[in-house]
């Protein structure tokens, strides 16, 4: 009987880390599936941390910093009460991303006819690849793009709504009042970007460009 008890204990010791790793992998899969909802519908997770360094509890609290990447090799904080451990995790995510549908020259406008969505592994893409095709509305390419090339945020800009030297309408508003005046834009700016304007008096003011090309200043 003693031999049997010892055998059971040894088996429990040998296989408990495997069971813990399996449960933790499932928890991590659920964690990243929730984080990537709407972006990826196919997530695979593998733990790279050694089994003896895994959290000691069955249901650790998992978290990541707000600016962390959600795929590739990442670090996840696992808490068991006061015990904190960082897990090295590899996340593979599959979903849609935006590519050039045809050759696009630098300075060309990105529109429905020359960009498209493609499905593939998001974790293997260049940094800051565009996932939402709506981000390219009224965008201008900053470099030549080849067919099927993933489009990155650094490769385009929004079309200028206001250009340097243009006469613009400045609208200053505050609590219960609003005033309009004209001035000259000192820089190029897209919608929702800041533009500096020299007023007739010579004073330089700064405001946000709206969809109509007005410069809005909140006082």
Swiss-Prot record:
The gene is flgA. Its main location: periplasm. Residues 1-21 form the signal peptide. Coiled coil: none annotated. One of its GO terms (cellular component) is periplasmic space. GO terms for biological process: bacterial-type flagellum assembly; bacterial-type flagellum-dependent cell motility. InterPro entries: Flag_basal_body_FlgA_C, Flagellar_FlgA, SAF. Keywords: Bacterial flagellum biogenesis, Periplasm, Signal. It is found in: Periplasm. Involved in the assembly process of the P-ring formation. It may associate with FlgF on the rod constituting a structure essential for the P-ring assembly or may act as a modulator protein for the P-ring assembly. It comes from Escherichia coli (strain K12). PANTHER family: FLAGELLA BASAL BODY P-RING FORMATION PROTEIN FLGA (PTHR36307:SF1). Pfam families: ChapFlgA (PF13144). This is Flagella basal body P-ring formation protein FlgA. The keyword Signal applies. Belongs to the FlgA family.
């Amino acid at each position: 009987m003693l031999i049997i008890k010892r055998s059971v204990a040894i088996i429990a010791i040998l296989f408990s880390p495997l069971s813990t790793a399996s449960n933790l992998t499932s928890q991590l899969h659920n964690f990243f599936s929730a984080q990537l909802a709407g972006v990826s519908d196919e997530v695979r997770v593998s733990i790279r941390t050694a089994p003896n360094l895994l959290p000691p509890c069955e249901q650790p609290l998992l978290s990541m910093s707000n600016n962390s990447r959600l795929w590739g090799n990442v670090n996840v904080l696992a808490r068991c009460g006061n015990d904190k451990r960082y897990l090295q995790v590899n996340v593979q995510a599959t979903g849609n991303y935006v590519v050039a549908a045809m050759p696009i020259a630098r300075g060309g406008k990105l529109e429905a006819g020359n960009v498209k969505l493609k499905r593939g592994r998001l974790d293997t893409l260049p940094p800051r690849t565009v996932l939402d095709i709506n981000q390219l509305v009224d965008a201008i390419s900053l470099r030549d793009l080849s067919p099927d090339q993933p489009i990155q945020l650094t490769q385009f800009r929004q079309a200028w709504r206001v250009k340097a030297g243009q006469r613009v309408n400045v609208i200053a508003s505050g609590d219960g009042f609003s005033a309009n005046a004209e001035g000259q834009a000192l820089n190029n700016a897209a919608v929702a970007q800041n533009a500096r304007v020299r007023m007739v008096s010579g004073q330089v003011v700064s405001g946000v460009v709206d969809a109509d090309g007005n410069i809005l200043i909140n006082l």
